[in-house]
């Protein structure tokens, strides 16, 4: 029977994953809070102390730092000497390590954090197990992100958990532990940047970097321009998160944390033009992110309008010469790798909230057409583009999109029909190929009726209202194709 050690601070999906491992004939060992959760869920699990024959001591500071754990992880299965030494010491092989670390970054993000709190959230045993398992990836599977649970299970069931895939997991581990250690160094060095002011001039502010990863705003290389402001940083982060969702050339423009124009195309120049045309007024003074290198041709287009920040994975030398003619525009070079951090947090009075990032994308095959009329191919393309964008828009959110750009955005309204009115009234075009996209369900049929009055012929929304049928009936009445996804995307 294979053995797995599970010790996680982020408990997302761990119970389901552990149950599946037991069904695949894994014997589970765990520590502290993880073991308690598995026990409560009636998942068969043993204490790591059963491996080490040594109790957890010093309030859990020493749990897994033991030869019985690390010998079982690090042994090279191809070396008889290693296996003989394990046998002599009565040490069992460990085949899988599932660990994520104490939430140091989240802890120190609290402005009132004490030094003792920070120190207690420095993980020692977790990184040690992760690094050991990652080093021995040829024989041991190591998982640091809950997002990888499902694929690991699929590969176990299909007997395709091969060395190449384990190596990809190994890379994630060393990226994760490097960022973790860097966050610790930055905190204790006091690595914070004083900003001119906060959201408004009467508010003081500073920027604390907990990572210097090249795919983050904190790790961006600023090539030109003034110091980033508090609002620049927030808007740039929102812009970057959205543009990374696109594989095709894409451009995102953001104002006040909301997209004002999103465009895709065969080239990045075409994508920018589509984003600009989506709302040529609101982009003025905004933040623009592009997921392809900025060429001289594109730089001329960008230079022609006032922008606060331009983000791209690369700027050619000629493009830089053009853009640097404006002394204040901030130019940020950022790796477009998708952020592997699965959590986000926000401070509230007396504490902070932590949640998984809203990265889930519903596959098209799981979406359901609920009306008599089905979407055309072009309407499907418009829906899927809008569905990528809508999680980045403040709720209540309604987007209008075609297959190359957003054409109208209604954001941050207290009722859904109000958001729809804004999107419809500001739309640069409405025709049979434009889709209406909603981040939440329709509580009644009025939004669909309003859409019909403006000529909308395709709608995508989560569904889930007790009055879903009213909206479906209204769509059928007007010959509108409606798709439900089963997943909402509120953003506050």
From Swiss-Prot:
Keyword Transferase: yes
Signal peptide: none
Catalytic activity: (6R)-10-formyltetrahydrofolate + 5-amino-1-(5-phospho-beta-D-ribosyl)imidazole-4-carboxamide = 5-formamido-1-(5-phospho-D-ribosyl)imidazole-4-carboxamide + (6S)-5,6,7,8-tetrahydrofolate; IMP + H2O = 5-formamido-1-(5-phospho-D-ribosyl)imidazole-4-carboxamide
GO molecular function: IMP cyclohydrolase activity; phosphoribosylaminoimidazolecarboxamide formyltransferase activity
Annotated ranges, domain MGS-like: 1-144
Pathway(s) per entry: Purine metabolism; IMP biosynthesis via de novo pathway; 5-formamido-1-(5-phospho-D-ribosyl)imidazole-4-carboxamide from 5-amino-1-(5-phospho-D-ribosyl)imidazole-4-carboxamide (10-formyl THF route): step 1/1; Purine metabolism; IMP biosynthesis via de novo pathway; IMP from 5-formamido-1-(5-phospho-D-ribosyl)imidazole-4-carboxamide: step 1/1
SMART domains named among the record's database cross-references: AICARFT_IMPCHas (SM00798), MGS (SM00851)
GO BP annotation list: 'de novo' IMP biosynthetic process
EC number: 2.1.2.3, 3.5.4.10
One Pfam family from the record: AICARFT_IMPCHas
Keyword set, alphabetical order: Hydrolase, Multifunctional enzyme, Purine biosynthesis, Transferase
InterPro entries for the chain: AICAR_Tfase_dup_dom_sf, Cytidine_deaminase-like, MGS-like_dom, MGS-like_dom_sf, PurH-like
GO cellular component, one term: cytosol
NCBIfam families: PRK00881.1, purH
Stated family: Belongs to the PurH family.
Domain remark in the UniProt entry: The IMP cyclohydrolase activity resides in the N-terminal region.
HAMAP family: PurH
PANTHER family with a match to the protein in the record: BIFUNCTIONAL PURINE BIOSYNTHESIS PROTEIN ATIC (PTHR11692:SF0), BIFUNCTIONAL PURINE BIOSYNTHESIS PROTEIN PURH (PTHR11692)
Protein name, per record: Bifunctional purine biosynthesis protein PurH
Species name: Staphylococcus aureus (strain NCTC 8325 / PS 47)
Gene name per UniProt: purH
